């Protein structure tokens, strides 16, 4: 944890929050430790934009969960710090939501085993938030609750916050762009029974590892998650962007290959530090699903689905591109300056989307399906009055502007 402490001190000096050490000094030792780790893993912008009370509340609530909730106690420290303690999921506005969500669900979850508790949390999420397209801005978890709707990125951010508030390690997973159709999608992974499982946020099912997107996920070229802090041991890392680490989750959903690329200069020497974009055709543009920087040997690699890709590399004003078929694993050699894009002519290309079919989805039993149907009927019957009443009760506990 020495590196985290050094990172905290560096960002403290960078942001100039002189009152923060005094606030931490007034906390119990373990709460202060968690708060410092939380700050250390957060972008400097969050230090400046987010009231300290949000970070301190997250630390105090995470400590309570660690000491009092069985599934939180069982988590390895890296998972607890990155996926329970930390307030940030993606690029949403941060707010002090964890105590609010826990207060709403504590009694409802009492006595439930892990998986049943996760499913119950997702039912609660569905009772309060439904899918509706919005703009590209991601609202805070409490703002989504107040509105009662959100796009998939907001639903998944909301559900991750609710799961973390109840002591589960949870994260948002994201397909930057589909290869077989336009647009993208985000959903949730939760740590349950010692393994990661997926679910559609605010889309309750009778079992985990089941959602409308099962087949689509099996056709993804890339599925990734974000980690603020240290990723779990053994994670397949794509790269780091500031304080966020991108982890590759594709192999959990689709048939994959390890595609390697070697970048050289015009003299055949390895080109270190060149960015390689792995691009997917979507919405009439080549979208960089992932960008990997070459190492000292000029090599870059990505675990990806079995679909066509456009590779684009650039360094020092020079570039090169190539198209790879689903069967290719490389190494694909790209020579900087040898083949720059030529917009003055048309070239035919043939692209293939992944076939899909690899998602290991669960199949509910007959009793599970019956229970799910009964719960959904009950929810639909009570929606108009019960949801309004519950939402009103929760909003009374919110003391901060949204």
Region locations from a protein language model:
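N-terminal accessory/pre-domain segments preceding catalytic cores
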Residues: 1-118, 122, 165, 196, ...
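Hydrophobic/aromatic-rich core segments of domains that either
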Residues: 103-123, 132-142, 147-239
